[in-house]
C-alpha cells in the first residue's frame, strides 16, 4: 500500500485540484488497466529471485503512460517523479527511494517494443471502447501528418537518422516522419496507424488504414485518384468522398454548378474534420511535436501508444461514470 508523506497528506483535501490532478484521476478511471497489464505480464520478470526485486508492473506501465501524456524523456521522467507528488501517487510509488531510475524506465520501454505491445494496446483500447458502445461504424477517414525529426543527432557522427527523409510542403522543407491514420467517421476513433518517412506520398498508405468493413472512404485532395490504384481494386466496393483539388474548382464556369460543387465540398470537409481531432490531441495536448527516438520502429511504437491514449482521452467524458450533481 502507498504511504503518504506528511506533506502529501497536508496538501490533499484542502486546496483546489490542479488540471493535472483532474486529468490523471480521469485517466485512472478510463484506462483498461487489467487488459493492458495482462498483455505485458507474461513477459515481465517475476519477483522471487535473489537480489533486487523488479518494480511492480503496474508502476512501470503507469510511468510509461505518464511519459506519453507529458512528453517526458527517460531522465526527465525520473526527475519529474522526484519533484511532483501527483505523478508519484499516480504511478503508485510509495516513497522517494522507490522511484525507478532512467535506465529502468528505458529497459521497460525496450521490453514493450520487443513484444510489439503498442499495436496490441491500440487493439485492446478499441476493443474496450467497443464494449462501452464506442464501436467502429461504416466509414473511414484517412489522413497524414508530419512529425519533425532533429536534423542532427547526438550520435558519434552527428548524422541525420537514415530512416527519416525530407519532404516539401508549401514552400517549406520538413525532415522527419509521417504518421498516417484511419479514423472512424462517426466516433472519431483511430483504428489504424502507419508510420513512414516524410517523403512517402499519403495515397500509397491508404489501403493499410482500412478495417475492411467500411462502405465509405473520405480523404483530402492528396488522395485524388485513390479508387484507380491497383491495391484498392482488391478491396470491397467503397464510396469515395475525396476532396476536389482547388484547381479543379476553378475550372467550373457554370454559377449554379459551382455553388452546388462548393456545397458538396463543404459537406465532405465537415465530415473529414473528425480526423483532425486525434492529431490535435497528440500534438497540442500531449505535446508530441518531434520524433523522440532513432529509426521508424521505435517511433512507430510511440505513435501507436499515443493514438491509443488519444482515443481514451477523447472518449473519457462518455466513459466516466456520471457523477450525480450534489444539491447544496
Regions found by a protein language model. Give the residues of each.
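Helix-centered, glycine/charged polyanion-binding patches within enzymatic domains
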Residues: 7-10, 215-216, 221-301
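Secondary-structure capping and boundary motifs in well-ordered enzyme cores
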Residues: 29-32, 52-59, 97-101, 267, ...
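An N-terminal domain-cap segment
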Residues: 39-58
Amino acid at each position: 500500500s502507498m504511504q503518504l508523506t506528511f506533506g502529501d497528506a497536508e496538501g490533499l483535501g484542502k486546496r483546489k485540484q490542479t488540471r493535472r490532478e483532474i486529468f490523471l484521476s480521469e485517466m485512472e478511471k478510463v484506462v483498461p488497466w487489467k487488459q493492458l497489464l495482462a498483455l505485458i505480464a507474461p513477459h515481465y520478470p517475476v519477483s522471487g529471485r535473489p537480489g533486487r526485486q523488479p518494480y511492480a508492473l503496474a508502476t512501470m506501465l503507469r510511468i510509461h503512460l505518464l511519459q506519453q501524456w507529458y512528453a517526458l524523456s527517460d531522465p526527465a521522467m525520473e526527475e519529474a517523479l522526484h519533484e511532483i507528488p501527483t505523478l508519484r501517487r499516480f504511478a503508485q510509488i510509495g516513497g522517494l527511494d522507490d522511484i525507478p531510475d532512467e535506465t529502468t524506465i528505458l529497459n521497460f520501454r525496450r521490453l514493450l517494443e520487443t513484444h510489439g505491445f503498442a499495436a496490441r494496446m491500440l487493439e485492446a483500447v478499441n476493443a474496450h471502447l467497443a464494449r462501452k458502445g464506442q464501436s467502429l461504424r461504416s466509414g473511414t477517414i484517412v489522413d497524414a501528418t508530419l512529425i519533425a525529426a532533429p536534423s542532427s543527432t547526438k550520435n558519434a557522427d552527428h548524422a541525420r537518422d537514415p530512416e527519416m527523409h525530407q519532404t516539401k510542403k508549401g514552400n517549406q522543407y520538413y525532415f522527419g516522419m509521417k504518421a498516417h491514420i484511419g479514423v472512424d467517421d462517426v466516433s472519431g476513433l483511430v483504428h489504424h496507424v502507419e508510420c513512414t518517412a516524410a517523403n512517402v506520398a499519403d495515397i500509397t498508405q491508404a489501403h493499410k488504414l482500412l478495417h475492411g468493413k467500411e462502405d465509405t472512404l473520405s480523404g483530402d485532395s492528396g488522395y485524388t485518384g485513390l479508387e484507380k490504384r491497383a491495391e484498392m481494386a482488391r478491396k470491397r466496393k467503397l464510396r469515395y468522398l475525396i476532396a476536389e483539388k482547388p484547381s479543379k474548382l476553378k475550372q467550373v464556369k457554370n454559377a449554379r454548378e459551382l455553388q452546388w460543387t462548393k456545397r458538396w465540398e463543404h459537406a465532405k470537409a465537415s465530415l473529414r474534420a473528425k480526423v483532425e481531432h486525434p492529431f490535435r490531441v497528440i500534438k497540442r495536448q500531449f505535446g508530441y511535436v518531434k520524433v523522440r527516438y532513432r529509426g521508424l520502429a521505435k517511433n512507430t511504437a510511440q505513435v501507436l501508444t499515443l493514438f491509443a491514449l488519444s482515443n481514451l482521452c477523447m472518449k473519457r467524458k462518455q466513459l466516466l461514470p456520471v457523477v450525480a450533481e450534489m444539491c447544496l
